[in-house]
């Protein structure tokens, strides 16, 4: 019998609620930009669950006014996306900050080139994946486990060969706690606003949101208590 098979629906609901998390700030090459700066922060830490909704692009219901800052990031630079339990960022001791450790799933980062990173319309963009942290069978550790251990810091490098210009940076933590069927997976995501400087002229092929994820994708519909190997949803990670 599965260890968790006896959990009540109430307990599952409680875990689902406490697993909530929000990407709400950025650090670029060691410089913390501050809470809500250059990030479209949703006012709620509730997840997106409908992968066919436009909410799967950058979320919805943003704290107003939305930041007009576009963060300068050199190609090849290091970015940290900071997650916390609430939209306000770190607000003091909280056993569920940055997310409840019962949350299990991958953490991923995408970019989409845009004319203006502050534009309100985010539909029709082409997204390419630049980083992911999925599941390590040898240690039975998920990307979300590392996110918790690292205090909500998802750290990755901007590819050095990318064409300079403005981009939206989509970072998400996916909870697979109740993902044995669709809908079940929960998507916690926001979009940062960056301007990549330097670099080269590479424009990677992108995918659509909605569209990149499907209701039958084993990266979205899975049993975390019986997982052997795991491939996160979406395209392969781009590399120069």
UniProtKB/Swiss-Prot annotation:
The keyword Iron does not apply. GO terms for cellular component: extracellular region. Glycans are attached at residues 153, 195. It comes from the Eukaryota. One of its GO terms (biological process) is cellulose catabolic process. It is found in: Secreted. InterPro entries: AA9 (IPR049892), AA9_LPMO (IPR005103). Residues 1-19 form the signal peptide. Pfam families: AA9. Disulfide bonds join 58-191. Keywords: Carbohydrate metabolism, Cellulose degradation, Disulfide bond, Glycoprotein, Polysaccharide degradation, Secreted, Signal. Induction: Expression is induced upon growth on hardwood pulp. (1,4-beta-D-glucosyl)n binds at residues 32, 62, 67, 153. Unusual lytic polysaccharide monooxygenase (LPMO) that may have a hitherto unidentified role in fungal degradation of lignocellulosic biomass in conjunction with other secreted fungal enzymes. Binds polysaccharides but does not have the active site of two highly conserved histidine residues coordinating a copper ion (the histidine brace), which are essential for LPMO activity. Belongs to the polysaccharide monooxygenase AA9 family. This is Unusual AA9 family lytic polysaccharide monooxygenase B.
């Amino acid at each position: 019998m599965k260890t968790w098979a006896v959990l009540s629906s109430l307990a599952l609901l409680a875990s689902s609620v406490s697993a909530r998390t929000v990407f709400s700030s950025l650090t670029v090459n060691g410089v913390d930009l501050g809470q809500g700066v250059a990030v479209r922060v949703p006012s709620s830490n509730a997840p997106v669950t409908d992968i066919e909704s436009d909410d799967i692009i950058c979320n919805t219901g943003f704290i107003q006014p939305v930041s007009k800052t576009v963060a300068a990031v050199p190609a090849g630079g290091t970015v940290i996306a900071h997650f916390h339990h609430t939209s306000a960022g770190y607000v003091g001791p909280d056993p569920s900050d940055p997310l409840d450790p019962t949350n299990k799933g991958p953490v991923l980062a995408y970019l989409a080139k845009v004319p203006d990173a502050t534009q309100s319309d985010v539909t029709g963009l082409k997204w390419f994946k630049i980083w992911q942290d999925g599941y390590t069978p040898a240690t039975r550790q998920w990307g979300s486990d590392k996110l918790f251990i690292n205090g909500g810091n998802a750290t990755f490098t901007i590819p050095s060969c990318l064409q300079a210009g403005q981009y939206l940076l989509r970072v998400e933590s996916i909870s697979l706690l109740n993902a044995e069927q669709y809908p079940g997976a929960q998507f916690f995501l926001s979009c940062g606003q960056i301007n990549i400087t330097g670099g080269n002229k590479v424009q990677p092929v992108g995918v659509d949101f909605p569209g990149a994820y499907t209701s039958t994708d084993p990266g979205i519909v899975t049993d975390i208590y019986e997982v052997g190997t795991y491939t996160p949803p979406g395209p392969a990670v781009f590399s120069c």
